[in-house]
Every structure is written in structure tokens, then in C-alpha cells.
């Protein structure tokens, strides 16, 4: 509802596409630990049936979080939240805007109903037992357990987690056709009526599966499933490094453009690494390095992918670009949040925005960048939007730069020539 209330602002700014970080049910603020792929989180959507209690102080047993359980497992709340999302997409489409959802398909969360490590769904009549709960769970093959003997159940915590995180159980596609089919169904579901989303951004897409061969096989299937349901849906992947193996026309459409935009621009204009973890004076203003890096990485993408690549200055995984202009190396836990706002250079920020709005690709503004929001890397980069305290001059600059980008086709589909 909050997004719906601010659509006039987004439209006036010139926004044509809204990319959401994960919206599905999840216990975290970032929601990259999905609990239920079928429903929008009622804390974002609509809570129509409330009750229960929050965890008492000092209690860590989430099965006792009866208020959370009621909010996130009750069908009334889940269905009401999906209905509200349908209305949001309809309103965005009415305004000529598009919607991209974040698809986290490499792993889920320990709260997920398929695993249920937190025992949120245990004993609930509308849900099957999770793989953590029972060796006979219909979802057991969805995960890879290191100890498979029956004596390890109930409550088998010996499973594979993404990068070893037990809160992020890695999905075991190779051993479960049922899982593969379900995720392909999810890919179709949200781009189809009544939801009609316009595309997917795929989280850590190259990590999915246990082999490179299966990874490519899955994304080929995913593309067919999504494009059969909605031929115009965009498939955009998070990827670091050369994406060319996935951009041959049968897997991803394009990528978040770290290598051929965010990183070279950041080094050139600020001399900073994109997390603010390192400063390299020799790269600041180094035109040869900038052009060489851009040319090399752009050559890894064919023109159709390059023209829609997500060109960001900031996002939810890295420090805010405006903070990088202060040349402070470090993170919020060491420097404190106020340091992110100090000694920033808005002139350099404006230079970056001009490059963003005129370079080959799809300029993508991280919420709040246009209003002067600062922040070190995750989680400090996810501050709330400063309603009533925006940098109006910076907003006006963004608005004008966006207008110029939209009014000149050459900035969207023209070729690039470097004048040396």
C-alpha cells in the first residue's frame, strides 16, 4: 500500500519500471530467505486476521511466536496480500509502468514450509511436515542431508546451506524433479494472470544447482516456462564476472551490470571499491583503465543484452554511491552511520548520474539515491527513504537527466564511440 501511495512521485520522477527486492513471505528485513514462494508477505501486504503473542524476552524458540505464525501461515492474510499485490500491478500497468520481482531460487530460508527448521508449520492442519521435522516429509528430497539415517529425525539439522549458512538451506534440484517442476511453476505463476508481473531478477543465479551443466539446463527450462507464459517477460540475473555463457538467447536476457558499468564508473569517479572496502588512488580519474575495462566487459554481451543491462550506481548489496564520494574506507560497524554522510561530493554524484543516463544500458536508480540518501554497505545502505527531508536539488537533477534519457532514442539504442 505504501508503494501505491507514492506512485505519483515515482511517475513524476520518470520511473518506468519498479524492481522489488523479495516480496514473498520471509522472517527477515531483506527477505532473501523465502518462507513461502506462493504468497506476498502479509507484513508488506495485508493483515486481516491477527492475534497471538510475540516471543517473550530471552526466548529464542520461534515455534512459540504465535503472532508471527498467525500472520504468515493463515490463508486469510496470505490471500489478502496477494489480492493487494494484484491491485498494485494493475495500477502500475495503468500508468504505463512495469514490475520486476526478485526470484531467490538457489536457496530458501530455514523458516520455509518445505524445511520448517523453526517449527512454524509443525502440526498445522493445512501443511505437510517439513523435511527438518520428519524423514517422511514430502519435501525431504528438496534438500541435501548429510546424515540420512532415520535416527537423525525428528529435527535433522544436518543439511546443506548456501555458503554454509543454516538459515539459507540450498535447494537440491538434481535429486528432486518435483522441486524443479514447482520452481518452474512459480516462475510461470507470477508472470501470468492475475499477477501479470513483467519479469524476474534472479538472485545468485550462477550458483543454482551443484554443477555448471545442471545450472544451464535449469535456466533453459526456466526461460521456456516464463516466456511461454509471458513472451515479453524480462529475465535478468545477478552475476559477477563474464555472463556470456548464459546470454546466448536460451537462458537469461541480461544481467545486473556490475562489470561493464557499476565497477568501472565507481573506480573512475571515486577511486573506491563498490563496498567502500578499498581505495585505489591510481584508478581515480584513470581514463585508460576506465575505457579499457568498459570496452572489455561490454564485449561479453551481445547488443540486445547490453541495451537492457541494469546500470546501477548503488543497490542493496553495496555502499551508496554518494557515500563512496567521501573516500572513507570501512563499514558502518567500524565507522558509525554518521560517517557515511560526511564529506560527500554531490558534484561527483551528478557526474555519475549523467553517465548513468547516457551510457548504453537501462539506468536503474536505487531508491533514495535521487534524494541524497547515504550509507555504507549492507545493512547501512538500506536506510528508510527520507520523506520530508529529501535533497530537492538532487531530485530535480535526476528528474531532468531521466527526461533527457527518455526523450532521445539514441541514448537507449544508439551505438557507443569513444573519442580519444
Where are these regions (language model features)?
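Substrate-binding/active-site clefts of carbohydrate-active enzymes
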Residues: 1-16, 23-194, 222, 228, ...
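Short, flexible loop/turn elements at secondary-structure junctions
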Residues: 24, 41-44, 105, 175, ...
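Conserved N-terminal glycine/acidic-rich loop preference
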Residues: 168, 186-193, 197-226, 242-263
Amino acid at each position: 500500500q505504501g508503494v501505491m501511495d507514492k506512485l505519483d512521485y515515482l511517475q513524476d520522477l520518470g520511473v518506468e519500471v519498479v524492481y522489488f527486492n523479495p516480496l514473498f513471505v520471509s522472517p527477515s528485513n531483506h527477505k532473501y530467505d523465502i518462507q513461502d514462494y506462493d504468497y506476498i508477505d502479509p507484513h508488506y501486504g495485508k493483515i486481516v486476521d491477527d492475534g497471538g503473542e510475540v516471543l517473550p524476552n530471552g526466548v529464542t524458540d520461534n515455534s512459540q511466536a504465535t503472532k508471527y505464525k498467525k500472520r504468515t501461515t493463515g490463508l486469510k492474510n496470505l490471500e489478502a496480500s496477494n489480492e493487494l499485490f494484484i491491485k498494485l500491478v494493475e495500477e502500475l500497468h495503468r500508468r504505463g509502468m512495469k514490475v520486476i520481482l526478485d526470484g531467490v531460487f538457489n536457496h530458501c530460508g530455514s523458516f520455509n514450509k518445505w524445511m520448517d527448521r523453526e517449527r512454524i508449520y509443525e502440526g498445522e492442519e493445512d501443511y505437510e511436515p517439513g523435511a527438518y521435522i520428519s524423514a517422511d516429509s514430502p519435501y525431504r528430497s528438496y534438500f541435501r542431508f548429510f546424515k540420512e539415517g532415520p535416527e537423525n529425525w525428528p529435527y535433522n539439522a544436518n543439511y546443506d546451506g548456501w555458503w554454509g549458512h543454516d538459515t539459507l538451506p540450498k535447494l537440491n534440484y538434481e535429486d528432486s524433479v518435483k522441486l524443479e517442476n514447482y520452481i518452474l511453476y512459480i516462475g510461470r505463476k507470477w508472470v501470468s494472470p492475475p499477477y501479470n508481473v513483467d519479469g524476474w531478477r534472479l538472485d545468485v543465479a550462477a550458483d543454482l544447482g551443484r554443477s555448471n551443466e545442471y545450472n544451464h539446463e535449469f535456466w533453459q527450462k526456466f526461460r521456456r516456462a516464463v516466456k511461454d507464459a509471458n513472451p515479453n517477460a524480462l529475465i535478468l540475473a545477478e552475476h559477477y564476472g563474464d555472463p556470456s555463457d548464459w546470454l546466448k538467447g536460451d537462458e537469461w536476457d541480461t544481467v545486473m551490470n556490475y562489470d561493464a558499468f557499476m565497477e568501472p564508473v565507481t573506480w573512475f569517479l571515486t577511486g573506491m571499491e563498490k563496498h567502500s572496502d578499498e581505495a585505489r588512488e591510481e584508478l581515480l580519474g584513470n581514463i585508460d583503465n576506465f575505457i579499457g575495462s568498459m570496452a572489455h566487459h561490454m564485449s561479453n554481451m551481445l547488443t540486445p543484452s547490453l541495451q537492457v543491462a541494469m546500470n546501477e550506481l548503488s543497490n542493496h548489496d553495496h555502499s551508496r554511491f554518494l557515500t563512496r564520494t567521501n573516500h572513507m574506507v570501512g563499514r558502518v560497524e567500524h565507522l558509525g552511520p554518521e560517517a557515511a554522510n560526511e564529506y560527500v561530493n554531490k558534484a561527483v554524484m551528478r557526474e555519475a548520474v549523467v553517465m548513468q543516463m547516457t551510457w548504453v544500458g537501462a539506468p536503474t536508480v536505487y531508491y533514495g539515491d535521487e534524494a541524497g540518501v547515504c550509507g555504507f554497505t549492507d545493512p547501512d545502505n538500506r536506510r528508510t527513504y527520507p520523506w520530508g527531508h529529501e535533497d530537492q536539488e538532487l531530485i530535480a537533477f535526476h528528474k531532468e537527466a531521466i527526461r533527457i534519457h527518455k526523450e532521445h532514442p539514441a541514448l537507449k539504442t544508439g551505438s557507443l564511440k569513444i573519442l580519444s
